[in-house]
Swiss-Prot record:
Class of enzymatic activity (EC top level): ligase
Protein's cellular compartments: Cytoplasm
Catalytic activity: tRNA(Trp) + L-tryptophan + ATP = L-tryptophyl-tRNA(Trp) + AMP + diphosphate + H(+)
GO cellular component: cytoplasm
Presence of keyword Metal-binding: no
GO process annotations (BP): tryptophanyl-tRNA aminoacylation
Designated name of the protein: Tryptophan--tRNA ligase
Organism: Rickettsia bellii (strain RML369-C)
Record's subunit section: Homodimer.
Binding site residues for ATP: Q10, A11, T12, G18, N19, G146, E147, D148, I186, K195, M196, S197, K198, S199
Source organism phylogeny: Bacteria, Pseudomonadati, Pseudomonadota, Alphaproteobacteria, Rickettsiales
Family stated for the protein in its record: Belongs to the class-I aminoacyl-tRNA synthetase family.
Positions contributing to L-tryptophan binding: D134
GO molecular function terms noted in the UniProt entry: ATP binding; tryptophan-tRNA ligase activity
Length: 328
């Protein structure tokens, strides 16, 4: 029997090269080998202020990107998180066994809430519990994540352990965390110490998957390097050029040493890197535009995926509710 893989991307903003190399491209490979559930995390999206029209648009656009990148709805289950109400139901059950102290240690809440944490919503604080519900509800064997989500996955494992000990049986599967290799952590084009992010105020900090060719050339040309005039790889001393080299090697699948030897300076290196990015993204962008012209098809995929996901999700929730003593 195939192992189950679960992952998702928050449905806000425009997906970028970091999302593609860190998550989506790997999902496309995994769909051949695993029983995959890939979702649009729209419940997570409302933990910050977002206009209703933007949320709806983001869900549809993200789905179109998933499909354009190569995810096959006949091979994987793709759905919007909010369409499977059991996610929220399980999150509440898990909230009731998760110690407050565990959530206070979550570093992402501190980062996202900023200095005035008193004004942050409860949903943002309990975000990791909903994330745990997203994973545990499908009894996932493997959860591929970036390094920045490792703390949340450890919390998920801890929560599963609490439930299993409470009822003295393995109700929830403790998942294996899969931290990706090359290309999983693409950094900002403006600051090599920060991860590429759709929430960054500067659009030139990232390559959006829908950027046209001219804009990609502009962004790579203006990407920060340093005062040195040669190409070399050193994550600590030269984070910006090292990040560009990571992108180059991941997309071209060439050896790092060969790439470094081919370039004396930044100009030709950046020009070639932009072309490599365009070669990889243009077919996806063309397919995306085609899919966006068929909204009826996209909605059909979401509803079919949700219906399929709900079968698995309801089994887990009902099993746990029975253990708690609810009448079902």
């Amino acid at each position: 029997m195939k192992k189950t893989v679960l992952s998702g991307v928050q449905a806000t903003g425009s997906l970028h090269l970091g999302n593609y190399l860190g998550s989506i491209r790997n999902w496309v490979k995994m769909q051949e080998e695993y029983n995959c559930f890939f979702f649009l995390a729209d419940l997570h999206s409302i933990t910050v202020d977002i206009a209703p029209s933007e949320l709806k648009r983001s869900v549809i656009e993200t789905l179109a990107i998933y499909l354009a990148a190569g995810l096959d709805p006949n091979k994987v289950t793709i759905f919007a998180q909010s369409m499977v109400k059991e996610h929220a139901e399980l999150a509440w059950l898990l909230n009731c066994v998760t110690p407050l102290g565990w959530l206070k240690r979550m570093t992402q809440f501190k980062d996202k809430a900023g200095k005035d944490q008193e004004k942050a919503c409860l949903g943002l604080f309990s975000y990791p519990v909903l994330m745990a519900a997203d994973i545990l509800i499908y009894k996932a064997d493997i959860v591929p994540v970036g390094e920045d989500q490792k703390q949340h996955l450890e919390l998920t494992r801890d929560i599963a352990g609490v439930i299993n000990r409470k009822f003295n049986k393995e109700i929830l599967k403790v998942p294996e965390v899969l931290i990706g290799g090359s290309g999983t952590r693409i950094m900002s084009l403006r600051d090599g110490s920060k991860k590429m992010s759709k929430s960054d105020s500067s659009d030139f900090s990232r390559i959006n998957l829908r950027d046209d060719n001219d804009l990609i050339h502009q962004k790579i040309k203006k990407a920060k390097t340093d005062h040195l005039s040669f190409v070399s790889y050193d994550k600590e001393a030269r984070p910006e050029i090292s990040n560009l080299l990571d992108i180059y090697t991941t997309l071209s699948e060439e050896k790092l040493e060969n790439i470094i030897q081919n370039y004396e300076g930044f100009a030709k290196f950046k020009e070639d890197l932009a072309e490599i990015i365009i070669t990889n993204l243009q077919p996806m962008r063309d397919k995306y535009l085609e899919l966006m012209n068929d909204q009826e098809y996209l909605l059909k995929i979401l509803h079919q995926g949700a219906e399929k996901a709900r079968v698995r999700a309801s089994e887990t929730v009902n099993e746990l509710k029975e253990q708690f003593g609810f009448v079902i």
